Amino acid sequence: MCMSQFPIEFQIECAASTINHARDIYAKFILQPLSYTQALTMGNSLRRVLLSELESISITAVRIAGASHELATLKGVREDVLQIMLNLKQIVWRGQLKKQPTITRLKVQGPAIVTAAAFQSEANSSANIIDTCQYIATIDTQDILEMECQLEQSSGYRLAKPSEMIDWLPIDGVFMPVKRVNFWVDKALVDKVLVDKALHLEIWTNGSISPQEALHQAARILTHWFNPLQTLEWKTSHTKNEQTMAQLSNMLIEELDLSVRAYNCLKRAQIHSVADLMQYTQEELLALKNFGQKSVEEVNKALEQKLHCQLKKYVD
């Protein structure tokens, strides 16, 4: 490989950065100078990793006092259980879980508007809520809304699975801190001169991670994937075919445990070793005197059992 194809001075610039909302952060990066194929390869690779491989925290199950299924309604609560679960799914968490799963609890007495700020995580949890104003439900009476939520950390989108725990309702896990990625390739401006190409990369996150950190993690993941390819050691041992041929040359047809009829026919044809036998096709063996189809099948069965191979049917 010609290393001169790669730029000597690779530059990356954060051209724009905007916090539209606690759960909506945007940044644009320019990577230059690159050839067109380099920019396209980097853009595609980074986009796929950003959207599917970065980890985050999500609620994956909930247990609500007084609710046994998703279609249940709760006394004094305006939303049904299904709507509450959809609202819980929108909560964005930041941090690292010290253990999985982690339980977070909520208990509010009405009348009240319940938001994510009401959650209390376990003492040893480092998970924090990005937007504590995230709406969950409204209690119109003096009734109590009480629930426990199960937090997990992973990557990608995971469909809800039936919970083995009693009264727990599963929720789809959204472990996707990056909401959207866009890229395109354009001319690069270096020292006021247009040279080569530039990769323009736009990243939108849900606030649990900054676009800069997302890009850093994606690059680290790609490096981890590709690094082993630089130190591959190819074994120079014999191939399977070479090993099989070595076995054939040293093995006599007596070791195939053939019937007396088949054995005698082969011996009369001056076939003494398995290597000799493998020079024949099934069609050629059938041409031998007193060697019929049953004998051919017997030979093939013996070869399969002993050496995991068979005779060719016809001459190539």
Swiss-Prot record:
It holds the Pfam family RNA_pol_A_CTD. It comes from the Eukaryota. Residues 1-233 are annotated as: Alpha N-terminal domain (alpha-NTD). It catalyses: RNA(n) + a ribonucleoside 5'-triphosphate = RNA(n+1) + diphosphate. Its main location: plastid. One of its GO terms (cellular component) is chloroplast. Gene3D superfamilies: 5' to 3' exonuclease, C-terminal subdomain, DNA-directed RNA polymerase, insert domain, RNA polymerase, RBP11-like subunit. Residues 245-316 are annotated as: Alpha C-terminal domain (alpha-CTD). Keywords: Chloroplast, DNA-directed RNA polymerase, Nucleotidyltransferase, Plastid, Transcription, Transferase. Its EC number is 2.7.7.6. The keyword Phosphoprotein does not apply. It is found in: Plastid, Chloroplast. InterPro entries: DNA-dir_RNA_pol_insert (IPR011262), DNA-dir_RNA_pol_RpoA/D/Rpb3 (IPR011263), DNA-dir_RpoA (IPR011773), RBP11-like (IPR036603), RNAP_asu_C (IPR011260), RNApol_insert_sf (IPR036643). The keyword Chloroplast applies. One of its GO terms (biological process) is DNA-templated transcription. GO terms for molecular function: DNA binding; DNA-directed RNA polymerase activity; protein dimerization activity. The N-terminal domain is essential for RNAP assembly and basal transcription, whereas the C-terminal domain is involved in interaction with transcriptional regulators and with upstream promoter elements. DNA-dependent RNA polymerase catalyzes the transcription of DNA into RNA using the four ribonucleoside triphosphates as substrates. In plastids the minimal PEP RNA polymerase catalytic core is composed of four subunits: alpha, beta, beta', and beta''. When a (nuclear-encoded) sigma factor is associated with the core the holoenzyme is formed, which can initiate transcription. Belongs to the RNA polymerase alpha chain family. This is DNA-directed RNA polymerase subunit alpha. It comes from Cyanidioschyzon merolae (strain NIES-3377 / 10D). The gene is rpoA.
